[in-house]
C-alpha cells in the first residue's frame, strides 16, 4: 500500500438547487462563490423534467462556461454543480464532476467533496465483480455500490452504499424526481441547507454561496444524515446513528471563505479569535503586525487588537494568482509564491515584524515571505502561525499527501525557524485553536478534527493504515 492512493483525494466544492426555473444559472453563481475550493475543473448537471444534461471541463468556472450556450442548454428546475481540486496527473475531463450514471431505467448525477479511506479496497472488489470505472476518482465508487446493492428499496440501496464507504464525504445526488444530500458520520466536510424567496431549496459546501443568490440559511446537514429534496419539500433522514462530529479544523483555518458560517461559527470571527489567542501565546517583542493575504488577514486583526500593535499592510497580493496550498505540484507552488506576493518597503523597513500566517505546510511560502520582508528592510521577522504545527497527513479530503511533505513532521520548531529564516516561530496551541473556534458541542476536541496536529484520527484509516504507520519512522530533511 503506497501513498499513491492518496491521489484520489480532492478538496472541492459542491452546490445544488431544487425547484427554481433557472437552476443551472443559479448553480453557476453558487459555484462561483466556491471557486476558492478548487480551480482545476468545474461542471454543472441539470434536470429538465427527468432529462439530465451536463457540461464539464478542466479550468476555472468562467473558462468552463466561457461559451454562454454551454450554460443555456442546461435547462430545468434542479441542478448540481462541482468545482474540483485535482492532485498531480488527474486533471482530465473524465475526472471532472458531476458524474452521470445510468441505473436500471433511470439516470442520476453525483458530486462529491472529500476522500474515502477504503477506496482502494472497494474499487478492487468492485472491479473483481465486473464493475467498470470511467474515472480514477473515488467519487465513482458510491454509484457502483448503489447499483450492486441487493436491498429491495432504492433508498435502502443508497443507505447501504453510504454505510459501506468510509472517510470524509459530502455527496450530492440528483435523480429525475429528487435531490439527495448526504454527509459522512463525522461531518468532516461542511454542508449547509438554504431556501430562496420562491421556495427553492439549496445545498452548498459553504454558506457564502447563499448570499450571492439571495438564499437564507436553514441549517447545516448533520453527520450521518441523508436529506431529500423533492416535490414534498425537505425530508431529513439518517443512514446511521453511529456519529460523532469532527469537522475539519482546516476549514476554519484556511479553506472556507471568511463570510461563511460553519456549525454556527463565522469563519472570520473564528480566525480573529485564533489571532487573539496567538498574541497571548506569543513571547517576543515587535513593532508591527503584518498578515499574509488573504486567509491570514482575519487572524492578523485579532493578533493586533489583542497585542496593541499596529496592523499594517506590509504584503500585497496579486489577486490573479492561484492559492499555493492547492496547486498540484511543488514546482507550481514555488513559482506561485514568487508571483503572488510583494513586500511594502515603506511599511516594514526598520521594523520588527510579526508575520501572521494561517499554516506552514512545506515551508516554501514562509521561507520566501520572510526573505521578501527582510529584503524590504525589516530588521526582524517573527513568524506567528494561527494554527498548530501540521505534522500529520489528512485522509479525509485535503491535499496533505504524506508526512514527508510536512516540515513540522520532520523538524523541530527551532529547526523549522532556521529553515524559513525567521527570528522566531510561534504556533497556536491545539487547545487555543479549539477554544478559539468555539463550536457549541460536547463532542471531543470541540467537534473538530485536529488529527493533522496530534496524529489522533477519529476513524480507522483502512487502506492508509499500514503505510501511515511505516511513515512514522521515516524522516525527510528540509535543509
Enumerate the predicted regions with their spans:
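Conserved short alpha-helical segments that host acidic/polar catalytic motifs at enzyme active sites
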Residues: 1-223, 228-286, 292, 380
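Short, well-ordered loop/turn and helix-capping segments at boundaries between secondary-structure elements
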Residues: 20, 128, 148-151, 309, ...
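Flexible loop/turn segments at secondary-structure boundaries
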Residues: 22-24, 87-88, 118, 188-189, ...
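Generic beta-strand/beta-sheet core signal
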Residues: 111, 174, 182-183, 194, ...
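Secondary-structure transition/capping motifs at alpha-helix termini
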Residues: 131, 151-152, 283-287, 305-312, ...
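Phosphate/diphosphate-binding loops
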Residues: 160, 208-209, 216-217, 224-225, ...
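PRPP-dependent phosphoribosyltransferase catalytic core
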Residues: 162, 177-178, 214-220, 314, ...
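Short, glycine/charge-rich flexible loops or terminal/linker lids adjacent to PRPP-binding catalytic cores
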Residues: 308-353, 364, 391-397, 401
Amino acid at each position: 500500500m503506497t501513498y499513491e492512493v492518496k491521489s484520489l483525494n480532492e478538496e472541492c466544492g459542491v452546490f445544488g438547487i431544487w425547484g427554481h426555473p433557472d437552476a443551472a444559472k443559479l448553480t453557476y453563481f453558487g459555484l462561483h462563490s466556491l471557486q476558492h475550493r478548487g480551480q482545476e475543473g468545474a461542471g454543472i448537471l441539470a434536470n429538465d423534467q427527468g432529462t439530465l444534461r451536463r457540461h464539464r471541463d478542466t479550468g476555472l468556472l468562467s473558462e468552463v462556461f466561457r461559451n454562454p450556450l454551454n450554460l443555456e442548454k442546461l435547462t430545468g428546475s434542479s441542478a448540481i454543480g462541482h468545482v474540483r481540486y485535482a492532485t498531480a496527473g488527474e486533471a482530465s475531463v473524465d475526472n471532472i464532476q458531476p458524474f452521470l450514471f445510468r441505473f436500471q431505467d433511470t439516470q442520476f448525477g453525483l458530486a462529491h467533496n472529500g476522500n474515502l479511506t477504503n477506496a482502494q479496497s472497494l474499487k478492487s472488489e468492485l472491479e473483481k465483480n465486473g464493475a467498470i470505472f470511467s474515472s480514477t476518482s473515488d467519487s465513482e465508487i458510491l454509484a457502483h455500490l448503489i447499483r450492486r446493492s441487493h436491498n429491495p428499496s432504492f433508498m435502502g440501496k443508497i443507505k447501504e452504499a453510504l454505510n459501506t464507504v468510509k472517510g470524509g464525504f459530502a455527496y450530492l445526488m440528483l435523480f429525475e424526481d429528487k435531490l439527495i444530500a448526504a454527509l459522512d458520520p463525522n461531518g468532516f466536510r461542511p454542508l449547509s441547507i438554504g431556501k430562496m424567496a420562491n421556495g427553492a431549496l439549496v445545498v452548498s459546501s459553504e454558506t457564502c454561496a447563499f448570499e450571492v443568490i439571495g438564499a437564507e440559511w436553514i441549517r447545516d446537514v448533520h453527520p450521518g444524515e441523508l436529506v431529500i429534496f423533492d416535490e414534498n419539500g425537505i425530508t431529513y433522514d439518517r443512514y446511521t446513528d453511529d456519529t460523532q462530529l469532527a469537522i475539519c479544523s482546516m476549514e476554519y483555518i484556511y479553506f472556507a471563505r471568511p463570510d461563511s458560517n460553519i456549525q454556527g461559527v463565522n469563519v472570520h470571527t473564528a480566525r480573529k479569535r485564533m489571532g487573539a489567542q496567538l498574541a497571548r501565546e506569543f513571547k517576543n517583542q515587535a513593532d508591527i503586525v503584518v498578515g499574509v493575504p488573504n486567509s491570514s488577514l482575519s487572524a492578523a486583526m485579532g493578533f493586533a487588537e489583542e497585542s496593541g500593535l499596529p496592523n499594517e499592510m506590509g504584503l500585497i497580493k496579486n489577486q490573479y494568482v492561484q492559492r499555493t496550498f492547492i496547486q498540484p505540484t511543488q514546482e507550481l507552488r514555488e513559482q506561485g509564491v514568487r508571483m503572488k506576493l510583494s513586500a511594502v518597503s515603506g511599511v516594514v523597513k526598520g521594523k520588527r515584524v510579526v508575520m501572521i500566517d494561517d499554516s506552514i505546510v512545506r515551508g516554501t511560502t514562509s521561507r520566501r515571505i520572510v526573505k521578501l520582508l527582510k529584503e524590504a528592510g525589516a530588521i526582524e521577522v517573527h513568524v506567528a502561525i494561527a494554527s498548530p504545527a501540521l505534522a500529520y497527513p489528512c485522509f479525509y479530503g485535503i491535499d496533505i499527501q504524506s508526512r514527508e511533505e510536512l516540515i513540522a513532521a520532520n523538524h523541530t520548531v527551532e529547526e523549522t525557524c532556521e529553515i524559513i529564516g525567521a527570528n522566531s516561530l510561534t504556533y497556536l496551541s491545539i487547545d487555543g485553536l479549539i477554544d478559539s473556534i468555539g463550536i457549541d458541542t460536547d463532542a471531543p476536541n470541540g467537534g473538530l478534527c485536529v488529527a493533522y496536529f496530534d496524529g489522533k484520527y477519529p476513524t480507522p484509516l483502512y487502506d492508509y493504515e499500514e503505510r501511515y504507520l511505516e511513515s512514522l519512522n521515516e524522516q525527510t530533511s528540509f535543509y
